[in-house]
Each structure stands twice: as C-alpha cells, then as structure tokens.
From Swiss-Prot:
It holds the Pfam family QueC. InterPro entries: QueC, Rossmann-like_a/b/a_fold. GO terms for biological process: queuosine biosynthetic process. Signal peptide: none annotated. This is 7-cyano-7-deazaguanine synthase. Its EC number is 6.3.4.20. It comes from Halorhodospira halophila (strain DSM 244 / SL1). Pathway: Purine metabolism; 7-cyano-7-deazaguanine biosynthesis. Coiled coil: none annotated. Belongs to the QueC family.
Amino acid sequence: MAERPQRVPASTEQESALVLFSGGQDSTACLAWALEYFSRVETVGFAYGQRHDVELSAREEVLDGLRALRPDWAARLGSDRVLDAGVLGEISDTALTQDAEIAYDARGLPTTFVPGRNLLFFTLAAAVAHRRGIRHLVAGVCETDFSGYPDCRDDTVKSLQVTLNLGMAERLVLHTPLMWLDKAQTWMLAEQLGGSALVDLTVEASHTCYYGMREQRHEWGYGCGECPACRLRAEGWHRFRHGSGAQ
C-alpha cells in the first residue's frame, strides 16, 4: 500500500490554496488533497490550444462531482477560472497542439512535450495567487510515472519556487503531492481521500487521453487506450485494482 503524501503543517489548515487543475487524473487527486488540507481552495485551468481540449469540459464535471461528494469539500471549494494561454499553441509544434503523431526525439523527449508549458502555468498561477492573497500552489506534476517532461521534475519545481518568490517578493509554497507517486499510488491516494466514490468520479469524469477521445470507455476511464497518457493510466489502474502496487 502506498504511503499517503506527507500532511501539510497544521498551521496551513486555515489558509487557502490554488490548484492548477486540468481535469485529468493527477490534478483531480491533487484537488481532493488540497480540499482535505486547506480551508479554502480555488482552481485555475489553462486553454492553450491543446488537442485534448475536452479536458476543459471534464474540469466542470469533476468540480461538480467533488461538490456533490462531500459537503465539507463543497464548502471549501471556491472560485474557478480558465486562463487563455493560447500563445503556447501558436509558438509550439507538438503533438499536443498540432495534428501530429506521437514520437520521440533524439533527446528521448516525446513530441507531446510543450516547451515552457508548466513554467508558464506556474507563473500565471502565481500571478493569480498574488491577486487573490493565496500563498499555496498545488500541482499534479511528478517524476515517477511520467512522460519524461523536464518541467515536471522536482528540481524544476523547487527552482521555480525560488524564482517566483524572488520575482514577486512573495512567500509562495509550491506543493506537488504526487511527485514521488506512480499512477497506481495516485489511484490509491484518491481512494484514501474520497473512497470508492472519488475513484469512480475520477474514472467517469476526468480526462487523460492525448487525442481527446471520449467515445471508448475502459475500466480506468475514457480514451484511445494507446497514447502514452492512456497507457500510464491503464497500467496504474491494473496495479491498483489487482494489488501489485508500485513497481
């Protein structure tokens, strides 16, 4: 059984958090985590010309589902906003923003890597947090089960925290509850936080597939079943359901 991510200090439980929320499995788990540990939670998403923009609709379904799941979470869940980050789609040539096949380059990076995406997302989220008087940012990046993106690494996030605080004269804290969890452990975390109801909500409402497919339902959710994101989610589900745990 996966260990639960370390609880945030008790002194933060009367504070607010801003969750970078895409509508995917990872950010859904992070949103539930934040709702468990912070007194007020707001969310921010990004429209950047992604092929799988169905995730923007999934966000609304997940938010509604979380409100219905637990009254205390509904009371803590605050405003949501989606920011226009379309410039990423304009300047990038990737399989997430263009009609292109998913492959790997000479560095071993998949063509789904959007250069600067998470760097920009954290910066925009920090600006929102500054305006809203929020000190804690929560994101679902990890470097265990991930696609090799350099902007998901722990070193990147730690460096960003320093840079954002220097550049904004703030004391922001960037939380990454999934950083050292694999996908099986992320499913376990959802179960620990919200029971089978949160697992079911994640299966039915959250979206992962890079191709944006919602026509085919699998036991782990909707998607093509073939892209790297679907395969990671499916493999994690299998280990979670069949008890083999983390590899």
